[in-house]
Regions:
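Conserved Rossmann-like nucleotide-binding pocket used by diverse enzymes
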Residues: 2, 26, 52-54
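Structural micro-motif
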Residues: 62, 68-77, 92-95
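Non-catalytic, surface beta->alpha helical segment in thiol-disulfide oxidoreductase systems
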Residues: 78-105
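A short beta-strand-turn-helix
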Residues: 3-21
Length: 105
């Protein structure tokens, strides 16, 4: 499954549906965000049917970035059953992101 690009309405709907979600808050001008993009795509395929992997463009969806206190990008926030359970800031190997997903499946 491809990465889901969320707007605020789609994000809120996905969050309300519960389950495990990993969301990358990013911007098109952000170099580290561009470096992280292939990792996010890989995780979306790897966890298809197990977790929802999405992205939020902070320039287009500023209200979401403010709501979750995103001050640096890339910021990856994990949600389970509608609640934030973890977050990671910066570029990391896929295994670092996967470990949080695996621990919460």
């Amino acid at each position: 499954m491809a990465v889901i690009h969320f707007n605020e309405q789609g994000f809120d709907k996905a969050l309300a549906n519960g389950g495990l979600m990993m969301v990358d808050f990013w911007a098109s001008w952000c170099g580290p965000c561009k470096m992280l993009a292939p990792t996010i795509d890989q995780l979306a395929q790897q966890y298809e049917g197990k977790a929802l992997i999405g992205k939020v463009n902070v320039d287009e969806e500023q209200a979401l970035a403010i709501r979750y206190g995103v001050m640096s990008i890339p910021t990856v926030i994990y949600f389970k059953d509608g609640q934030e359970i973890d977050r990671k800031v910066g570029v990391m190997p896929a295994a670092a992101f996967a470990s949080v997903l695996d621990a919460n499946l």
